[in-house]
Amino acid sequence: MAIISSSLDESNIPRSRKELRLVDSKIIAEEKINKNLNLARPNSFKEFIGQEQIKSSLKIAIEASKYRKEALEHTLLYGQPGLGKTTLALLISYEMNTKCKVASAPSLERPRDIVGLLLGLKEGEILFIDEIHRLNKLTEELLYSAMEDFRLDLTMGANRGTRCRTINLPKFTLIGATTKLASISAPLRDRFGLCHKIELYSNDELHQIIFNFATLINLQLENDACSALAKISRGTPRIALRLLKRVRDYAQVIKNTNKISLEIIEKALNSQKIDNKGLDNIDRKFLSFLNLNNNHPIGLDSIAAGLGEESSMLEFVVEPYLIQIGFIMRTPRGRKLTSLGKKYISSRNEKY
């Protein structure tokens, strides 16, 4: 049973502003309100490119729910940022022919915030909570009975004025999205009947996504240019579309054209200091730092101190792609370059 207290700390914790990386898969403010990106969202599973296994499983679950005339089981979607978790949640609501209310866990600071959302739901509707691993303890505990028994157990007041109240809720579906599955507590995680990992996209899938978006924003994108952009998009549609928009800016302003060739792609990305491997300055500094230390294993905290970056940012944002393309490896003693990574950074003759 959760307790609603008037003594909750409602202060906001300020966040330091970070330099924008075009190859960072996290969403930025501009993309949250960009109409073109919203238009690029598919309207059905048929239009959604990639994630075939997940789509197949979800279709079966949705059809089974319709057959039984029940709400879909609570669903947890996890994976790296920018892979389409929000889009999938909206498509589920479309396929279920119901409404979807969208919220972000950091905005649900007080228990009454989640209570208001739950009380506003109707039978069969969907509540989507992004970054669900960031729910505070009191808010999370309110969800336990709501998810399992479709009721709210509230304790209001204090001391002798304390009273308990149970409010029945309509049967709804909670869809949670997270980039950090391990950060979700076991009691919350166990209440999701469906759990799916959103995988990185193949180059062919990204090629199709980029081509479709280019057509949407009236760009004539040559096939080899599209392929080149797909290869450096880190398996992430959000990065692919962000890079395409920067290429469009370069083509229209510098070249006065909407026709995108491979040459324009290369020049546009070079102006943003992104090379043909999709690496930016931070990636190259990371590799150079390892190279300058004679490729001895180095601890993450030491690398972070040397580069002036947060160790968590390096671990979760920079390292995954460098490991994916085989440029670095993690060892018990620290990080070190692979032969591929050493060859790459040595050929550039760059110094940290």
UniProtKB/Swiss-Prot annotation:
GO terms for biological process: DNA recombination; DNA repair. It catalyses: ATP + H2O = ADP + phosphate + H(+). InterPro entries: AAA+_ATPase, AAA_lid_4, DNA_helicase_Holl-junc_RuvB, P-loop_NTPase, RuvB-like_N, RuvB_C, WH-like_DNA-bd_sf, WH_DNA-bd_sf. Residues 202-273 are annotated as: Small ATPAse domain (RuvB-S). Residues 276-352 are annotated as: Head domain (RuvB-H). Pfam families: AAA_lid_4 (PF17864), RuvB_C (PF05491), RuvB_N (PF05496). Gene3D superfamilies: 1.10.8.60, P-loop containing nucleotide triphosphate hydrolases (3.40.50.300), Winged helix-like DNA-binding domain superfamily/Winged helix DNA-binding domain (1.10.10.10). Residues 13-201 are annotated as: Large ATPase domain (RuvB-L). Mg(2+) binds at residue 86. Keywords: ATP-binding, Cytoplasm, DNA damage, DNA recombination, DNA repair, DNA-binding, Hydrolase, Nucleotide-binding. CDD domains: AAA (cd00009). SMART domains: AAA. ATP binds at residues 37, 41, 82, 85-87, 148-150, 191, 201, 238. DNA binds at residues 330, 335. GO terms for cellular component: cytoplasm; Holliday junction resolvase complex. Has 3 domains, the large (RuvB-L) and small ATPase (RuvB-S) domains and the C-terminal head (RuvB-H) domain. The head domain binds DNA, while the ATPase domains jointly bind ATP, ADP or are empty depending on the state of the subunit in the translocation cycle. During a single DNA translocation step the structure of each domain remains the same, but their relative positions change. Homohexamer. Forms an RuvA(8)-RuvB(12)-Holliday junction (HJ) complex. HJ DNA is sandwiched between 2 RuvA tetramers; dsDNA enters through RuvA and exits via RuvB. An RuvB hexamer assembles on each DNA strand where it exits the tetramer. Each RuvB hexamer is contacted by two RuvA subunits (via domain III) on 2 adjacent RuvB subunits; this complex drives branch migration. In the full resolvosome a probable DNA-RuvA(4)-RuvB(12)-RuvC(2) complex forms which resolves the HJ. The RuvA-RuvB-RuvC complex processes Holliday junction (HJ) DNA during genetic recombination and DNA repair, while the RuvA-RuvB complex plays an important role in the rescue of blocked DNA replication forks via replication fork reversal (RFR). RuvA specifically binds to HJ cruciform DNA, conferring on it an open structure. The RuvB hexamer acts as an ATP-dependent pump, pulling dsDNA into and through the RuvAB complex. RuvB forms 2 homohexamers on either side of HJ DNA bound by 1 or 2 RuvA tetramers; 4 subunits per hexamer contact DNA at a time. Belongs to the RuvB family. This is Holliday junction branch migration complex subunit RuvB. It comes from Prochlorococcus marinus subsp. pastoris (strain CCMP1986 / NIES-2087 / MED4). The lineage of its organism: Bacteria, Bacillati, Cyanobacteriota, Cyanophyceae, Synechococcales.
